[in-house]
Amino acid sequence: MSSYNYLNEKIILPISDTLLGNSIYKDLKFLMNSQWWSADELKEYQNEKLRALIKHSYDNVPYYNELFHSLHLTPEDIKTSKDLYKLPILTKDILRENIKNGKIIAKNISKKSLLLGSSSGSTGEPLQYYNTRDAESFNKACAIRGWYWMGYRLGDRYIKLSQNPRPLLKNIQDKFNNCFYISVQQLTDENFREIVEKINNFKPLFIRSYPDPMLFLTNYIIKNHIQIITPRAIATTGNILFDEYREKIENVFKCKIFDSYSCEGGANVSECETHNCYHSSMEYAITEILDNDMNDVENGCLGRVITTDLHNYAVPFIRYDTQDYIKKSKEKCNCGRELLAIDKIEGRDSDILITPSNKWLIVHNFTGYFEWIDSVEQFQV
């Protein structure tokens, strides 16, 4: 760790936490230790957090109090993650309705302290919900830990490519974080030329982006025979990173991609340095991977992601249906971490076709087929 990295992690981050009321530094320090816990230690931590969450939800959240009574359950009936099957799945529609009527918002948390969060809306109407400062800090710390797996340290020079407008506070934070933010709202050849110029001039150690803009930028570089600097790594998130995308981007930038996935409700997953799998942040949420009958899938199988956020006490997400599918790893990762190992992020339920014989076809199946047919420029299933 350089002196500049040390300054950012050990001094600037704690000062920022104090000024903004966050706890990212404390949480990151905890997570850098807990990532090496045994599976039993991780599950024990989850169960302890789950019991506290269930009691809080029963005592302070009308929706869950009514739900428990209707099921003739008490908080004592949910002692470990294995007991979660006793509770129904929380769908986005149920959540949206009960946020609107206020029944799923905790009564014992000041409205002034609530933070507004929102899903991307990629599958329809965005979901707006509330979060606590502590939960948001823990989530950010999990994301930073994932970046650390690719060799990043706070203060390292990086470029972020994104479509979102950058508010003043974010611009100020970018300066402190050594981040050069580049908007990719308009993807034209002229914009790509400017982006390449900015990347080459800034010489980032890391690049963060959605997969699609990185692919389009890569295609532009290939088409125009342009020289591009080689960062240490590229971090992608936000939509599916197809194998052919990864291969093409890595070949052009001559570095590895570290993919990640997150979703409202506690899903926070990052690819580790072995590139053999992703790891779910078990300290942040309980992740169930279920089949169509809502039973646990076997290792190596595809399943629906159901999450229980162990930290958001404002609007508890308990057995939340993310509508995403992931493939559970067959084996433990050889990185040594016993965090839940995931082979692939497969996409939304709207991206999966189930045949009459109950065979699941994901977007990858069609992409891999049509990429070899030159006459097909675009396709939609």
Please annotate each region the language model reported.
Residues 123-125, 154, 263, 325:
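Conformational gate/switch positions in structured elements
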Residues 2-12, 16-41, 48, 52-55, ...:
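Active-site glycine/GP-rich loop and adjacent strand/helix microenvironment
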Residues 86-90, 167-169, 268-271:
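Short, solvent-exposed polar/charged micro-motifs at secondary-structure junctions
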Residues 1-118, 125-139, 144-149, 153-156, ...:
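Nucleotide 5′-phosphate-binding alpha/beta core
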Residues 144-186:
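Conserved AMP-binding loop of ANL adenylate-forming enzymes
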